[in-house]
Regions:
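NAD(P)H-dependent oxidoreductase Rossmann-fold/reductase module
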Residues: 1-60, 64-86, 93, 152-156, ...
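Flexible cofactor-recognition loop at the NAD(P)H-binding site
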Residues: 13, 91-94, 142-145
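A short helix-coil junction within the Rossmann-fold of NAD(P)-dependent oxidoreductases
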Residues: 79-80, 96-98, 124-133
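Short alpha-helical oligomerization interface
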Residues: 96-111
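Conserved catalytic-core motifs of eukaryotic protein kinase domains, centered on the activation segment
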Residues: 97-99, 132, 149-151, 215-216
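Ankyrin-repeat alpha-helix packing hotspot
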Residues: 115-116
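A short, exposed helix-loop element centered on a Lys and neighboring polar residues
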Residues: 122-123, 188
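Conserved Rossmann-fold NAD(P)-dependent oxidoreductase catalytic core, especially the SDR/UDP-sugar
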Residues: 128-145, 149
Length: 313
């Protein structure tokens, strides 16, 4: 059987790098989609040597740039006959950043990278995924969405294109959590729209994991100290990479779509209650997610905004 093709964004460090190594070791043809080609070339060689698999390719991609995504998808479809697995792993979180950062299309950088970029890539590669016998998409989510158990927490749809630039300070963690909540909402809608084409779409809720040196190097002094301290007890990225592999390849998830899966590989259910003790249980547990994610009005808002900004309607 011809090797299956897996595309992983942000595959040059952390979980993405570990996942690329896992898939390569298992004999898959791996396409690393990365922004920093200097670092990524060295990582690619490292993965080839460790996996004994020469079918590890590298393509340049900036997930925050729509132009880069369009160029990448065009080049990918010209080079590969199909796509079997698409993993939206790349993410943006600038720890402690107090200034709003915008993408080349003037979209808040967290949302451009974590939400609108994956949406556009999925839209452009859907026809190539459809050529696979068992196409699967996995979106990397986060436990940060648990902040939405607070009924006051909402995505600020009026602050995604620099509307408050220079008017108030940016909260990097809020924007990161909001963008990942939006990605989860897109997961459910993508699963619905792509189901007739046989494409399964799920999300993995990533909890604690040891941060890479590359990630820590970008932080300010305070966050560096905190990250190094947390790394003493955080598990290695390889554990979460194993989850990527299992969800995207095993028969257990062959017919699963439109689900959020936790680090124990259990399907998470929407919360039935977000008040009192139930809210505390939800925040510290891993069995439920905020029902904000399935509210049809919110889902329609982010879906329509994605179509409008990416001009894919």
């Amino acid at each position: 059987m011809e090797n299956k093709i897996v595309l992983i964004t942000g595959a040059n460090s952390g979980i993405g790098k570990a996942a690329a190594l896992k898939f390569a070791t298992e004999g898959y043809r791996v396409v690393m989609a990365c922004r920093n080609m200097v670092i990524s070339n060295a990582v690619r060689q490292e993965i080839i040597e460790a996996s004994k698999n020469v079918q590890v390719d590298l393509m340049e991609l900036d997930v925050s740039s729509f132009d880069s995504i369009r160029a990448f998808c065009s080049a990918f479809k010209a080079q590969y006959p199909r796509l079997d697995i698409l993993i939206h792993n790349a993410a943006y979180l600038n720890h402690g950043e107090k200034a709003f950062k915008l993408s080349p299309e003037n979209i808040e950088l967290s949302f451009a990278t974590n939400t609108f970029g994956p949406f556009l890539m999925t839209q452009l590669l859907a026809d190539h995924l459809e050529k696979s016998q068992d196409p699967r998409i996995l979106n990397a989510c986060t436990t940060n969405i648990k902040h939405f158990f607070d009924p006051k927490r909402k995505i600020d749809f009026d602050n995604l294109q620099g509307e408050l630039l220079g008017k108030q300070l940016n909260n990097a963690y809020t924007m990161y959590g909001d963008s990942k909540m939006a990605l989860l909402m897109l997961t459910f809608k993508m699963a619905e729209t792509l189901k007739p084409h046989g494409i399964k779409v799920n999300a993995l809720q990533i909890n604690r994991v040891k941060l890479s040196k590359e990630t820590i190097r970008k932080m300010n002094s305070f966050w560096k100290v905190l990250a190094w301290t947390q790394n003493l007890t955080n598990p290695l990225p390889s554990g979460m990479a194993d989850n990527y592999f299992h969800i995207c390849t095993s028969d257990e998830y062959k017919n699963v779509t439109g689900q959020l899966i936790n680090h124990k590989r259990q399907i998470i259910q929407p919360s039935t209650s977000e008040q009192g003790f139930s809210q505390v249980k939800n925040i510290f547990g891993s069995g439920s997610y905020p029902n904000y994610a399935t509210d049809p009005i919110n889902v329609k808002k982010i879906w329509d905004l994605c179509i409008s900004l990416t001009k894919t309607g």
